[in-house]
């Protein structure tokens, strides 16, 4: 892949890679479309061939343990945007949630198979499906609005 990108980049620039820094090559924009062709559109499709494990609800989990797990899962999302939104939300609200609300939060962050869906629902880009449209989602949407203009450049400290 690197040789393809390098040779394609050199061919487009009409040059060789000798003397170029990796930074120059890495930041150059290479179009995979031919001359006069439009680039392929970006389509948000789920790959049905990849099996996604179904979330198994943890029965009889003590509330304190559940909140500890949810704090960890809120911080380790795999995408920066949700990591920041959910970790700051959890730091602010998780301790004060009762058992029912904690279960709703657990369902919200673990049942959707695509983290981008959670982000789009919370930011209002996509409508929230009925099964996730509850008081916790409303709290998250208000948190995302950031009415107090809090700085959220990194995840809050754990303790």
Curated annotation (Swiss-Prot):
Function, in words: Plays an essential role in the assembly of succinate dehydrogenase (SDH), an enzyme complex (also referred to as respiratory complex II) that is a component of both the tricarboxylic acid (TCA) cycle and the mitochondrial electron transport chain, and which couples the oxidation of succinate to fumarate with the reduction of ubiquinone (coenzyme Q) to ubiquinol. Required for flavinylation (covalent attachment of FAD) of the flavoprotein subunit of the SDH catalytic dimer.
Biological process according to GO: mitochondrial electron transport, succinate to ubiquinone; mitochondrial respiratory chain complex II assembly; protein-FAD linkage; tricarboxylic acid cycle
Cited InterPro entries: SDH, SDH_sf, SDHAF2
Superkingdom of source: Eukaryota
Family as reported in the entry's similarity comment: Belongs to the SDHAF2 family.
Keyword Mitochondrion listed: yes
Pfam hit, one: Sdh5
Residues spanning the signal sequence: none
Localization terms from the record: Mitochondrion matrix
Gene Ontology CC entries for this record: mitochondrial matrix; mitochondrion
Main location: mitochondrion
Protein name: Succinate dehydrogenase assembly factor 2, mitochondrial
Keyword Transit peptide: yes
